[in-house]
């Protein structure tokens, strides 16, 4: 029996911030001979994405409760119980040596099912503020890890696993050496875009004129509107795309990034070694603010809460950063990153499976 490969079940779903780090760890362990299956939901992004990575996926029925009506809240205990039963049946079939919770609603019943079967639970919190699911799963987990300090009081800080092509980028002092001309500004709103970026950055471009060149990722369905906004501001030369398929190439091109501060975005920007202007999504727990704060504290970024993200403030900030200042910020960003996060998480999963 000792010669059989170890088995891991990854529990992650809903958003790329949960799924992509889970995939990085899964591939790392699969390369070491592990058998990996995924626990997710059939109506979220993992349903299509995970099988494309050569990983079998099992589904349970669960969704979030935030913003739902009274009837949904009253039905929640039964829904969670049913999801727990589904997850428990899946794990009894697969018999994982360890489960890895990377976040999303699926981790709740999945983690509870594993615990009830005596399967060790390893948690990884991607954000600077722990989500509700991980807050209570931490009470039964064998190990809890965190990407940023402060999500849990005593958890090891291991960073966020990021894509290998981002980690493979040359260091800032190599990549940016000898670069001149207009400052290259990469604007990233995510797959859904960010209205505040789409509305503000064309006017910022008008103020800065030919001192900047912009690559603006607008999000689904917004490309034409944003192109028209740049043209209306007298700046039609800037590049607008709905999506960016190769983020590593975009990071390599950029001198500075303007973006939201989701956990994975912040970790990728640090790993790439890039200065940033972060505009945290407004949420009551200020999760994205806390994600970005370590980079601002390191002198690698500037945070603008959304009400302060004005044309004047952003234009003045960008105009005030020389190429020398941007290189210093880029080096500070890289210094904050934890480029071996994938290996750290995988190593802890392996350790727990052996004990």
From Swiss-Prot:
Entry GO terms, CC: plasma membrane
GO biological process: carbohydrate metabolic process; cell division; cell wall organization; lipid glycosylation; peptidoglycan biosynthetic process; regulation of cell shape
Nucleotidyltransferase keyword on record: no
UniProt-listed Enzyme Commission number(s): 2.4.1.227
Family assignment from sequence similarity: Belongs to the glycosyltransferase 28 family. MurG subfamily.
Purpose: Cell wall formation. Catalyzes the transfer of a GlcNAc subunit on undecaprenyl-pyrophosphoryl-MurNAc-pentapeptide (lipid intermediate I) to form undecaprenyl-pyrophosphoryl-MurNAc-(pentapeptide)GlcNAc (lipid intermediate II).
Name of the protein this chain belongs to: UDP-N-acetylglucosamine--N-acetylmuramyl-(pentapeptide) pyrophosphoryl-undecaprenol N-acetylglucosamine transferase
Lineage: Bacteria, Pseudomonadati, Pseudomonadota, Gammaproteobacteria, Enterobacterales
């Amino acid at each position: 029996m000792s010669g059989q490969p170890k088995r891991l079940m990854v529990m992650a779903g809903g958003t790329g911030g949960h799924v992509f780090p889970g995939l990085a760890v899964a591939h790392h362990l699969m390369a070491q001979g592990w058998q990996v299956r995924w626990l997710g939901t059939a109506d979220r992004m993992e349903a299509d994405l995970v099988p494309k990575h050569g990983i079998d996926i099992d589904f349970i029925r669960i969704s979030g409760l935030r913003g739902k009506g009274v009837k949904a809240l009253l039905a929640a205990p039964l829904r969670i119980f049913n999801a727990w039963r589904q997850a428990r049946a899946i794990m009894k079939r697969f018999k994982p040596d360890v489960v890895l919770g990377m976040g999303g609603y699926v981790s709740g019943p999945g983690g509870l099912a594993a615990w009830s079967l005596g399967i060790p639970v390893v948690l990884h919190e991607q954000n600077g503020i722990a989500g509700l699911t991980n807050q209570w799963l931490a009470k039964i987990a064998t190990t809890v890890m965190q990407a940023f300090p402060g999500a849990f009081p005593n958890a090891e800080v291991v960073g966020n696993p990021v894509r290998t092509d981002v980690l493979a980028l040359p260091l800032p002092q190599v990549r940016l050496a000898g670069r001149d001309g207009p400052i290259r500004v990469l604007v990233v709103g995510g797959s859904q875009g960010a209205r505040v970026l789409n509305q503000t950055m064309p006017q910022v471009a008008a103020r800065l004129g030919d001192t900047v060149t912009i690559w603006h990722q607008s999000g689904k369905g917004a490309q034409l509107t944003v192109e028209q906004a740049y043209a209306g501001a007298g700046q039609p030369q800037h590049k607008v795309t709905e999506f960016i398929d190769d983020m590593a190439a975009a990071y390599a091109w950029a001198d500075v990034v303007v973006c939201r501060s989701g956990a994975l975005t912040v970790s990728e920007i640090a790993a790439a070694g890039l200065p940033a202007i972060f505009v945290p999504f407004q949420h009551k727990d200020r999760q994205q603010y806390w994600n970005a704060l370590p980079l601002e504290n390191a002198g690698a970024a500037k945070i603008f809460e959304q009400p302060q993200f004005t044309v004047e403030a952003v234009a003045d900030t960008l105009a005030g950063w020389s190429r020398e200042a941007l290189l210093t910020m880029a080096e500070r960003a890289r210094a904050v990153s934890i480029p071996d996060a994938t290996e750290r998480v995988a190593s802890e999963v392996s350790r727990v499976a052996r004990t």
